[in-house]
Amino acid sequence: TTAGTGSEVTAFSVITDHRRDYKLTVFSYELLPACAILDAELLTSAPASVAAACGIDAFIHAEEAYVSRAASPFSDAMAEKAMELLGGNIRRFVACREDIEAAENMLVGSLFAGIAFSFARLGNVHAMSHPISAYFDVPHGVANAVLLPVIAEYNALADHGRYFKIFNYISPFKVDAGEFEPGLLPGAIRELCGEIGIPNGIVEAVNNASRNGPVSRETIEEKIEAMAADAMKSGNIAVNPRASRQSDIEMLYRRAL
């Protein structure tokens, strides 16, 4: 695997149904391997865009597991170490994939994040990103990344303390608990994404992925109701730290455009 999915240690897989524009998550312990080998040398040929998309996906695995309603002391330990490794190395790794130390830290961080979300599940980011990828063929990690700023700010109202820690894992400018406010999150996340070449918003991400010419904002907006309905079918909605109805999901999509 790349330093992203953590699939080498999870019991989850995703199947894309192109006829229905739908991504289905499959869970089975039969998917767990007997042994997983992490070899950073295999990452050295990864394009920067792949390293960025997969790396931010790994960070979001840890972040969502950390704030999940199903979080536990065990998953917290895995998630915090994952965010430390991933947040501290993603810029360096994307800039130079041949940096073996950074690559190893990304791989181990991705693995810890995979263990964390196997126990604590994910949240609105992953529930909402799958429809974006299914309808518009946006890479999974990119779809997650463009949603994270608005969803993190939305969720932080329900769990201020944990998002304070998340902010310090991704931002080079650390703050004390008394200085932190949820409004700081979107800027810090977008700054990180900008540094590693991730698009800013759904419209830009969709157009970057499009193979058939420009896609208008209006075209994407027309799909929001259907995407929100699909997102609500995800079990991840139930463990998101802040309760969400379909109208909330539609609002978050619009904010993320």
Predicted regions and their residues:
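C-terminal charged capping/lid subdomain of soluble metabolic enzymes
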Residues: 173-257
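Active-site segments that bind and position negatively charged phosphate/pyrophosphate groups
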Residues: 65-188
